[in-house]
Swiss-Prot record:
This protein is one of the early assembly proteins of the 50S ribosomal subunit, although it is not seen to bind rRNA by itself. It is important during the early stages of 50S assembly. InterPro entries: Ribosomal_uL13, Ribosomal_uL13_bac-type, Ribosomal_uL13_CS, Ribosomal_uL13_sf. Keywords: Ribonucleoprotein, Ribosomal protein. The gene is rplM. It comes from the Bacteria. Disulfide bonds: none annotated. Belongs to the universal ribosomal protein uL13 family. It comes from Nostoc sp. (strain PCC 7120 / SAG 25.82 / UTEX 2576). This is Large ribosomal subunit protein uL13. NCBIfam families: rplM_bact (TIGR01066). GO terms for cellular component: cytosolic large ribosomal subunit. CDD domains: Ribosomal_L13.
Amino acid sequence: MSKTYLPPQESLERDWYVVDATDKRLGRLASEIAMILRGKNKAHYTPHLDTGDFVIVVNAKKVAVTGKKRTQKLYRRHSGRPGGMKTETFAKLQQRLPERIVEHAVKGMLPKNSLGKQLFTKLKVYAGPTHPHDAQKPKELNIHTIPGAES
């Protein structure tokens, strides 16, 4: 019987990455970010442990979607009160709270348990081009979301 390798938690190196979301496709960007948060890009990935890195997303207000999703994709939230369902299109939510779009997409790609909540805290999303995490010396991460494109 094979045993699952357990890396010592103190030996884990947690890197910080910064991702520019300008003109990136939302779903493809979110899936790459979720893989980094989980640590699936590392050799010592363990499914039930937090082995991932921190990710900073800048320019979330410039994220792109294809087709008619800008006007037809709906985001729903509920206040908890009777009749409290609110519905908003992608375009309106992008004007009001652009960070929430990226957060919602990434959160849906993480595990639905306490580990997923812990992983989600390592995601930092900002609408503009600046972020307050310069002290962590984040590395630039270029994610290609358009198949066949070089940018």
